[in-house]
């Protein structure tokens, strides 16, 4: 018969009592009342915060955007097809954040920073909030370094500086994305990290852009954030913030970054869809009242940091699409008022064969020549004024039957200057090449060249300079000034190349 030993039993009970953990885990739960169109209405969730992530039974995650008296309006970050009425939901106590690391370079990710290029997971030990506050006034310094786009028309007349926000605006099919991708390609060897955010675009268009970047060797310093047209509106709305968080990671590591949002019109439309489904009151063009804040809090994250924070920079090039050239619509005027200038692309110029189709009269950079090297200021200072005067002359010349020789010469030079500003896609030019090109055009060296042959002549001149006068490029790169020596070398090269070109044409 087994003998019961009371002292042994009491010691076991005492041990159990000592090991007892009285910690109670409180989970804030709710129930789905209604689900559909990427929106769920939830009863309960009394402790939920605005913008908090909530998790559904099937693992789908949503963001609590509407906190109402009787229910909570949640936008889903997924299709939500398996969520049913009556399913349970719990709060997570977190707001949206993404992993960040150097391993993201060269990769294609979605709005949740998950890889979508089929090249396996991305290792990251750090996290950043998707929506983090912009640097304050004390944390910034004024923009003073140029960010070269490689496009003569922009770098000479509408210069962009590191830490600036410059809007690219125009109708569909006017070359907005081409300007942005050329800028990324031109950052090769400039120690600039690029982030390209594609919002609501066709998958085929995105694939073409990635192919171009790969062929030009630009993917090694670029991250592509993709949410195509068939993505849920929530993810299209989040994608730009994800891109900004990835770019900020590098900015705070004392690096220079460039981010392109292609395009913010589609993000505004996704946000409008979410807001209307959440029954928020519509305003102008049915956009919600806070659509300005949607873009301002995103674009204010672009900055040039002060020396205490490492002088890193985040330059933003948002793209906005207009309808029939109407820049006075709601979203275009909002973004124009937030940014430090705009590059306006005209469909008339594009159709006339002037590419990039930049309307110099309507485009402006509010940073101005502070974002140019001294050599560019010396050479291109009067170019914008000269083009404006020629455009005015052309409008008068339409009504005049006979023009004096001076006017005819000015109009002929205008044609050559326009030809000089034309550039093929994916062929950005180095600063010294741009300076040589502008100097040749503005000082009348193209006046004797046929308009049709200007492009060929300039291409040959740039090659001739590189091969026979490498000192010219060296002077511009090292001194960043258009010295007398550089000018003498350039004039010599122009004269030699003109002689060669004339002989070529005769043969």
UniProtKB/Swiss-Prot annotation:
Gene Ontology MF annotations: ADP binding; ATP binding; proton-transporting ATP synthase activity, rotational mechanism
Source taxonomy: Eukaryota, Viridiplantae, Streptophyta, Embryophyta, Tracheophyta
Cellular component terms (Gene Ontology): chloroplast thylakoid membrane; proton-transporting ATP synthase complex
Similarity section: Belongs to the ATPase alpha/beta chains family.
Compartments where found: Plastid, Chloroplast thylakoid membrane
Sites marked Required for activity: 363
EC numbers, comma separated: 7.1.2.2
Ranges that cross the membrane: none
UniProt keyword Cell cycle, yes or no: no
The protein's name: ATP synthase subunit alpha, chloroplastic
Enzyme class: translocase
Catalytic activity, reaction form: ATP + H2O + 4 H(+)(in) = ADP + phosphate + 5 H(+)(out)
Keyword Ion transport among UniProt keywords: yes
Keywords: ATP synthesis, ATP-binding, CF(1), Chloroplast, Hydrogen ion transport, Ion transport, Membrane, Nucleotide-binding, Plastid, Thylakoid, Translocase, Transport
Record-listed ATP binding positions: 170-177
